[in-house]
Structures are given as structure tokens and as C-alpha cells.
Amino acid sequence: MNNQKNLLQAATEYIEANRIIAHHLLHYLSSMERQFLLRSEILDAFKELCDKDCPELCDSPLASIINCCQEAAMDTSWIYLALRPRIASWLFVRIHLESLQSEIITVAEFLQFKERLAAGTSDEDWVLEFDLAPFSREFYKLHEANSIGRGVEFLNRRLSSKLFEELGKGDKRLLAFLQVHRYRDLQLMLNENIEDVHDLRSSLRQADSFLQSEPQDKSWEDVYLDLRSYGFEPGWGNDVARIRNTMHLLLDILEAPSPNNLEDFLSRIPMIFSLAILSPHGYFGQADVLGRPDTGGQVVYILDQIRALEKEMRDRLLQQGLNIEPQIVVLTRLIPEAEGTTCNERLEPIVGTHNARILRVPFRNPDGEVIPHWISRFEIWPYLERFAIEGERELLAELSGRPDLIIGNYSDGNLVASLMSQRLGITQCNIAHALEKTKYLYSDLFWPDNEAQYHFSNQFTADLIAMNTADFIITSTYQEIAGTKESAGQYESYSLFSMPGLYRVVHGIDVHDPKFNIVSPGADPEVYFSYADKARRLTHLLPEIEELVFDQKLFDDRRGVLTEPDKPILFTMARMDHIKNITGLVEWYANNTTLRNEANLLIVSGHINPDLSSDAEERKQIQRMHSLMDQHQLDGQLRWLGVHLEKALAGELYRFIADRKGAFVQPALFEAFGLTVIEAMSSGLPTFATCFGGPLEIIEDGISGFHIDPTHGDSAADLMAEFFLKCREQDGYWEQISNGGLDRVEARYTWKKYAERMMTLSRIYGFWKYVSHLEREETQRYLQMFYGLQFRPRAQAMAE
């Protein structure tokens, strides 16, 4: 805070000493005749003024203010600035345009000013303010920006010392936690013979003395009766060596808890036997669904996640000596009009797993009738409460009891997870995948403009409730939480915002909350592997791929014939929507002669016939694709496939393009993570991807791929053209970037690492929730009221 005040003090003193220059700057900004200015617009205007009239401004204290300014709002008298001097730290200032008087203001005052400008009316007398700050004053929070997203490490450090103090006073919460574990009728860990911490220490010593003389590979079953007499039940390990190691970890914790020992010990406790994963919207299935509206990376993510989690759960249970089959159920929507998919089947086993399945429950209208057709993710809010109630009943029957962990996905799944977890009293994990608020400019401030199509008033309210209800939140990248030095994170954008006429958020989500953890996913290693791994290649698919890419015949699901098939291929695959920016890529390609000469463009996206799409935005993008291909005569250089590729075929397609020394491009305006980026890199395909979102962290620019700025398409096209030129002229360059991508994925982005971390996190948060009362009951009551008075009426109104 002192640094922030020093920053403002220096600027104030500069203004006083250089009033003409300061007035020139403010006049220049106000002359743009814009009530709201984005960071990029402010920086561009400042640079333009410095270059043209005021070079002395470049190194002035005002430059420091401008460089950390995220947005500005102004009327004829005042300019209000939102400053972000460092990551997740905000300061609000207003400056009078004539007198140059400046002062620090509150977040509420800043938001109120924006509301007045947006609504074009005078200030409302009373506005509902959403403020969770009073509920978190005494709760542990991170302070350093580099600690954000490492919540469990922070919790372990802070709370392990607290646990040590409480154990010294005879506290029994750790003991009670160890005694509470059961699997149906099977008692685990400790029995009634151990009554207090003193008994626990004594029993651990006796058991260790007994086990010391036993063969280290002797199984749990062979020593069970002896250990039971000391007070121990199954769950300590599958053989003597592991049992002793687990007991030693607990003895160390009882002696002096350390964060690492605590994490190692908790990661072994048999707490997670069943999972519920919630993903209501879209066509959730295993075949013929990818590329359909609202159906893409999230489905792939969850199916790969399930296979990795089930394997990790099975391995951990076996290591702890328990012959228990874990259960994972994905709860999604049943769609009677399934369009040839399995989405009309109530139960569907998940391929590649032992005991995971998809459970589908229909949406119903207020009269109880089943909704038969697909519904956009933006239109499903009226159905979620009833879906949560019916889904909970079906889930409990399917699992023969409560799940041990519930994982929500996207805004709808996270809201349903919140409703269920509160009723069932189980640990809740949220995964956003994408937060719509940051995708659409001023989507909060001008929410009425988008309400008919997107219903953001419901979605942003659901996000606020679910974020603050969750026990822990996992993200794929740091910037998903807290952005970069230059821009705010997706979650950070929910810390303060306003929806005029509804409510004003002055303290929404706090990115310094230890509930945030970065756990990056990977690509399915059975499907996405290096093109150079010849023994595993699916060569029987190559004729089908060659036909898809090069066949001269045209069908209803493809357009364009590549007249120079020997050229390398620039490949992209994504949904056909505005944010994915497929048509933007086509325009870049069309306008870059060098790129067109060096490479063909292959696009797998959407439908060729717009009449086949049920999504208005997709139809609009399809029509634009046809217009661009006609306008720029691209049919000989661009191949557009409106097909849905199964995973095995998609994996081999990546490798086929790598064989031909091609590249992959992900041109999205914003990408929360970038699963296709991981898939391409895992296949050894050099990758270009947007600098907005997850790919900025995934790719090391120039080493394991390349960043492109989708707002500067000409530069992006030039970069891709330069790459293909360099590959043609410099031996080994293509292989250098290809290997860099493979190395990066192996080091950071695998499902094995993901599953290990996810299972450890679920245990640690479950433990701290039990022993430290992390339920935040006061906050939950506040959120329940907000749900009942704000979300519920608006959702119900949609159904009328």
C-alpha cells in the first residue's frame, strides 16, 4: 500500500509542477470522446502524445500511472482511473479535468461512476452491494503474487504449526479425523482401542516394534490381527514396509508437524472411493459429439481426467492394502433428441475404465415435462435447480451412498455442485474451463445488451456463488487466476465489477484465497504421442486421412481441393464460433501471399452447410467462411472439413501433418487453457497459439512453439510465413521446434501428474475442512440468501 501511495504522490507532485503538460494529457484523452477507455487504448493514446507533442512525458511519474492503468472512465469533469500497480492489487483514483485535483477513491465510488455513465442517468439512491470482505477478515490469505495458485502449500505451512500447538494441548481433532474413515461397513485406520493422542503414540510405537522383526514384503492380511489389537484397521499399507513408512510419517507429525510430512501422510489416507463429476450442458458422450454446439474441449478434458483419476485411485487404494474398486460417475443431461449420439441413454460405461460411467438425467420444464431437444449453455439456467435435486437422488442410488468428492465443470456444473455439496456435506472442487465474463467486452457493465442471447446476469451470479462455495478451485494456468503484470486474470475480474440495475460487487472472489491451485492437464498419452514413435502409429488410418485431406471429390462435409498437395500443411481444429476465431485465421492467411505460397491451410471445424447447425453464432461464422473463400479464391489452397473426428483419427492426423513438416495454429481471441495446443505439441507438431490465455504459459516462445497476437493478424501471418521459410532454408529447424514442444509437454503437462496432484489436494482440503472448520458457514449463509433472492428469480423468469 505504501508503494501505491508513493506512486500516486509522485504523480500528484509532477502534476503540480507541470500543470500544462498534465492538462495536455488529460485533454488528449478526453478529446477521444469516449466514456470508457481500455488499457490498450490508453497506452496507444499516451504513446501517440509522447511521440507527437510531449516526449518528456515518457519518463515522468505520469507514465508510471498510465503503465499500470487497466481502464479509465470519464465525463466532462472527471477522469476515473483503475490502477493495478502489481498483480491482484488495485488502486482507484480520480482527477478533475480542469483543476487537476486528484484523490484516491473507493472501489464502490469507482463502480458507481461507471454505472452512472453506462446507464446515462443520475446515481441511484440505493444499490445492492455484494461484499464478502467481512467474512474473511480472520481467515488465512496469501500475500505474495508468486504464491497465488499454490493454496495447498500455503495452508499446510500455516496450519501445520497451528496443529502442533493444538496437539501439545491434547487436541483430539487429528485423532477424530483418523477414526472417522470408513468404507461402507469397513472401519479404516483406527478403531475404538485408541482413545486419545497418548494412546495413539503408544500404539504406533508398539506396532512399529512388532513390524520391525517381520519381513518387509509381508502383506497386510498376514499382520492384520496383530495390528488390530494395537488399534489399527486397514488403510495403512499393503505390506509391512509401506505400513511402517505411513506410521513413521504420523509419528513425525505428532512430534512436530511439517508441511511436507503432512502432505505425504494425508496423500495416503483412504478418503476418496467415489467421485461425482458434473457437466450438465452440451452433448456429453464418447462418440459423434465433438464439434457439436457447446461440445468440445471440456468433454475431452473430463473423459481423459476420469481415466487418469480412476487409475490413480486404484493404485492408491491397492498401495494402502484395500481391495476396493473406486467409482466415478459423470452426471450430465439426458437429451431425448440425441441426433445419433448416445445422449439419450441413461447410463453409459466409459471406455478405457474399470468402473466409471456417464449418468444422464433430463431437464424438465416447470410442469415436469422432459425437455427433448438440445439447449444452449446460455439458456439452461431455469432447469438447473430441479436437475440438481433429481440428479442428486439418481447419483446416491448409483453410488449406493454419497460421493467423497464432487467436481463441478463450467458455470452450470459448478452451480449444481454447490447446491449438491451443501446438502450432502461433501468436499467440492470447481473447474471453470472458461469464464465468459472476460470473453465479451464490458459484458458486466452493459449486460442488458447481451441478456436476450447470453443471459449473463444469471451466469455471472452463478459464478460468484459457486466460486465462493467451493472448497478448492483448480485452474490450468496462473493467469487464469491472476493474469499477468499487464492484465487482470479471469478469476480476478470477479473481484470487483458492476451490473447496473442488479448489483455491485465490491469484494467478490479473492485470488489470494488459498482455495486456488494450479493443476495443469495433459493429452491422452495413448492417443497423442510423437510422430516419430513409428511402432505405435495407426498406419491403417492413413488412407482415410489422405482421402480426407487430399481427395479431389467434393462432398457435403468438405470444401476446397488442395492443388499443390506437396506443400506443408498449416492445421487448425476448433469449434466454429467467434472466440475460436477460425474465420480470422482464414482472413490472415488469405491476405498473406508468402504464407499462401509456403503452406496449405487445413481446417476441421463446424459444418459446411449452415442449415445443419442449430447454433446462431456458428451459422454466422460458417457463412463468413464461405464468403472469405469466395472473395479470396481460396479453394485451391484451403481444405475445410466439416466433420467430427474421433480421437484416434485426430491423433493420427496430427502426426500425418507432422510427417509432412507442417504446423498447428490455435488463433483464438482468448483460450482459457488450450487442450488442442497440448495435443499438437504431444504429437511433435510445431505450434502457434494465441497469447491471450493458457497458451502463453504452455508455450515458451521460440523454443517450444510460438505466441501469436490475434488482434494483430498481419503480424501473426508473417510469423507463420517466416517459420515455413526458415524450415525450408535451414535444416533441422523444424525438428528443433518439434522437439522443444515434446520436451515441454513431458515436463509439465501429463495426466499422470494431474491425477496425482488432484487426489492429494482432495485429501488435504478434506482434512483441513474437518480439523479447522473451513466450511465458512457465515459465508455460505450469505451466498444462500444471494442465490434465493438474486439468482433464483431471474432463472425462473427465463422459463416464463
Language-model regions, residue ranges each:
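Catalytic cores of nucleotide-sugar-dependent glycosyltransferases that transfer UDP/GDP/TDP-activated
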Residues: 1-800
